[in-house]
Regions:
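Hydrophobic alpha-helical context, especially transmembrane and signal-peptide helices
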Residues: 13, 23, 27-30, 56, ...
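Generic alpha-helical structural signal
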Residues: 8, 12, 43-44, 57, ...
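Carbohydrate-interacting regions of secretory-pathway proteins
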Residues: 47-304
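N-terminal secretory signal peptides that target proteins for export/translocation
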Residues: 1-27
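Bacterial N-terminal signal peptides
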Residues: 29-43
Length: 304
């Protein structure tokens, strides 16, 4: 998440080595299409009410392999709960299996209809080839917002932001595994409610360091442990200690959420940890943020 409220206007396709991307044939699923459109464009409650969160006792598949019915779309650029440009769709064959496609054309997300707490989120993703203005030549960017609370769009005072109050699992070339704390406004009072989290960092630094000093953060990005200090916001950027796989390969990320604590893993490597968070439950938002991405597994596992 780098740009607050963009106006993407056009795509660019890039080729990648065949040994990385392979044959990515995919077609849109048509069975049950009207049911899918009706179910995932209907708005969730916008009064800011938070229903009782579900604690998984068995695996909950947020992507069922067929449609997007567990989610509601949020795209401020196209009116909120409408998706005329099919930013989000299901493809039935990407590397041999169905997946969610997030085109990246407009900033926004798929918001889960239900709230959750105390879980292990497991997601498998890979980047596509398409990038969009204003991030056409910048690092491929995406993310997953955890513990989303309040109204969609409440990260902006006018409730027209792509994002909402949450703790983000950042997915970006060179920075996958960062934590971003996103505050959100309350409509009734106009107050900005921050997302608060304590992380171990060295004094004056914003890189997670398990040997550091506990520091309370209320906004912004805290970098994963080995993010390259020389990182630049350029397409295809990679750091010498990145654990995200090269573009076109599948990655597995995990977010372990217990109470106000969060721990992130990228391809089996622990990259960051936060404790004593003010957000302990909420919806889950899958972002669209200027770069095509595919998600073939999105599931919540019980902690025990």
């Amino acid at each position: 998440m780098n740009s607050p409220n963009p106006s993407p206007i056009g795509p660019r396709r890039r080729q990648a080595p065949a040994n990385r991307l392979g044959r990515a044939r995919f077609t849109l699923i048509r069975s049950g299409l009207m049911l899918g459109i009706l179910s995932w464009t209907m708005p969730i409650c916008t009064a800011g009410a938070q229903e009782k969160a579900i604690v998984p006792t068995e695996v909950i598949a947020l992507f069922n392999g067929r449609d997007l019915s567990p989610f509601v779309v949020w795209l401020p650029a196209t009116g909120g709960h409408a998706d005329p440009d099919r930013v989000f769709s299901v493809v039935d064959n990407i590397d041999g299996a169905p997946a969610i496609r997030s085109s990246g054309q407009h900033f926004g997300g798929l918001i889960s209809r239900q709230s959750f707490r105390d879980y292990r989120l497991v997601v498998e993703y890979r980047w596509g080839l398409i990038t969009w203005k204003p991030r056409m030549d910048r690092a491929r960017d995406n993310g997953i917002l955890l513990h989303c609370q309040g109204e969609p769009g409440n990260a902006g005072r006018k409730f027209d932001s792509p994002w909402m109050r949450s703790v983000e699992f950042q997915i970006i070339e060179g920075g996958t595994g960062d934590i971003i704390l996103v505050g959100g406004f309350e409509r009734a009072t106009g107050d900005l409610i921050p997302a608060v989290l304590t992380l171990m960092v060295q004094p004056g630094q914003k890189y997670w360091d398990p040997t550091g000093v506990p520091t309370k953060f209320t906004k912004g990005r805290i970098n994963w442990q080995y993010r390259d200090p020389a990182w630049t916001d350029t397409l295809g950027v990679r750091g010498p200690r990145d654990v995200e796989k090269p573009t076109g390969e599948w990655n597995r990320i995990e977010a372990v959420c217990k109470g106000g604590d969060v721990t992130y893993f990228v391809n089996g490597t622990k990259v960051i940890e936060g404790t004593n968070g003010s957000l302990k439950e909420g919806r889950i938002l899958l972002q669209s943020e200027g770069a095509e991405i595919f998600l073939r597994r999105v599931e919540l596992q019980p902690l025990n």
